[in-house]
């Protein structure tokens, strides 16, 4: 094998690695969601705010939910499906009251959140999030109806290393396209 053909082979290998890395970057990025896209977690003016909001997002492992609220006025708890349905705030899975609650999504499943403050849940300050795939159970447990389902406890943690945005997705997509085009051009020149 001559030096020239070895160089061409190396270029093709490097380009293939770049394409694979570009595709993997998109898979490992995560998104930080501000719950409800609102300024604060609280009793909603529209009763369907927290039931509509998760339907417009695809949550995956590695994403995070950020609940913002005045700590002297509100709180956040994770509850079981039956407690979500009945607005029972006793014996929560997890309780936070720091006003800047970050919840990392660490496994697939359905999660149930509400305020620990009396009466807030019955005023629709509650959120059901399906991680991994859309769930018919999420639809069934919207404020108008409910059914029991398994609950998954997740741990809180630090802010994710990267926050996926439409700009980063576009950049990754553009990088992959350019790398693929270059690889095709090099392979075509070799042939």
Swiss-Prot record:
Disulfide bonds join 87-121. It is found in: Cell membrane. It comes from Arabidopsis thaliana (Mouse-ear cress). The gene is ENODL8. The keyword Nucleus does not apply. May act as a carbohydrate transporter. Residues 31-133 form the Phytocyanin domain. Keywords: Cell membrane, Disulfide bond, Glycoprotein, GPI-anchor, Lipoprotein, Membrane, Signal. Gene3D superfamilies: Cupredoxins - blue copper proteins. Pfam families: Cu_bind_like. GO terms for molecular function: electron transfer activity. Glycans are attached at residues 104, 108. Residues 166-191 form a propeptide. Residues 1-22 form the signal peptide. It is a lipid-anchor; GPI-anchor. It comes from the Eukaryota. This is Early nodulin-like protein 8. One of its GO terms (cellular component) is plasma membrane. Belongs to the early nodulin-like (ENODL) family. Transmembrane segments: none annotated. Mostly expressed in seedlings and roots, and, to a lower extent, in leaves, flowers, stems and seeds. A lipid is attached at residue 165 (GPI-anchor amidated serine). SUPFAM superfamilies: Cupredoxins.
